[in-house]
């Protein structure tokens, strides 16, 4: 199962934090690889801190590291810097799909048409696209797309506090998007991810912070993980 994250041109949606959280949860069930395809190396920093090279952009196979933390079985393809040969990374991902049961591709915000084209080899490999969006008009407009016939799971994420009325409004917007997508014969689901201040403190030395997230957050992430593990 290959999942690619997508937030359109909008950064700051909490996409990487959510990709890390889901990967940690899924790794308790199946062999998991989180591929950090962003120039900033956000997923790498969350799970491994200042990881040394070689990085994904230089040598995909040698970029694989295991997260050495109690109870975790997740691997990370570490990265720093922009990918210069996305096709080579895509070939590596195809090979890794035979070794890992679940791959999460953390793709950065795609700020222009050139960026979309550059990362298309990774998006094409995905069985499911995880759209991470916020309850605000700019984020919704930037991210609610379909990808051919690929399954879409939308996470309406609150990386900062939002009024319930606002969240409820955009939940209805996303519900309508999923309904219209289903009418086209494309599988679409959505999950509401509530704001949780503990998640912002996640880091390689603070994995135990996940023991202090709210029941609502934990339940939402578990539901998201369950949807992503579903074949169709």
Where are these regions (language model features)?
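Conserved beta-strand segments of the P-loop GTPase G domain that flank and frequently precede/overlap
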Residues: 35, 76-78, 104-106, 129-134, ...
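Switch I (G2) and immediately adjacent beta-strands of P-loop GTPase domains
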Residues: 61-81, 96
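Switch II (G3) loop of P-loop NTPases
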Residues: 77-82, 92-119
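Inter-motif core of Ras-like GTPase G domains
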Residues: 115-136
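Conserved C-terminal guanine-recognition region of P-loop GTPase G domains, centered on the G4
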Residues: 140-152
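Beta-strand-loop-alpha "switch" segments that mediate conformational coupling across diverse proteins
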Residues: 160-221, 227
């Amino acid at each position: 199962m290959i999942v690619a994250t997508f937030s359109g041109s909008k950064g700051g949606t909490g996409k990487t934090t959510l990709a890390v959280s889901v990967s940690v949860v899924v790794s308790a069930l199946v062999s998991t690889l989180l591929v950090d395809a962003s120039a900033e190396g956000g997923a790498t920093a969350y799970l491994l801190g200042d990881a040394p090279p070689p990085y994904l952009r230089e040598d995909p196979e040698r970029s694989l590291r295991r997260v050495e933390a109690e109870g975790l079985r997740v691997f990370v393809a570490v990265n720093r810097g922009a990918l210069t040969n996305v096709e080579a990374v895509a070939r590596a991902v195809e090979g890794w799909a035979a070794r890992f049961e679940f791959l999460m591709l953390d793709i950065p915000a795609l700020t222009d048409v050139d960026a979309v084209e550059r990362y298309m080899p990774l998006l094409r490999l995905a069985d499911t696209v995880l759209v991470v969006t916020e309850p605000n008009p700019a984020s919704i407009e930037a991210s609610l797309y379909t990808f051919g016939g690929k399954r879409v799971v939308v996470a309406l994420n609150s990386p900062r506090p939002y009024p319930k009325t606002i969240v409820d409004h955009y939940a209805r917007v996303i519900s309508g998007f999923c309904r219209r997508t289903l009418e086209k014969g494309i599988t679409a689901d959505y999950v509401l991810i509530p704001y949780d201040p503990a998640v912002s403190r996640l880091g390689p030395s603070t994995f135990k912070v996940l023991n202090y997230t709210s029941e609502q957050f934990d339940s939402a992430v578990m539901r998201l993980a369950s949807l992503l593990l579903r074949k169709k």
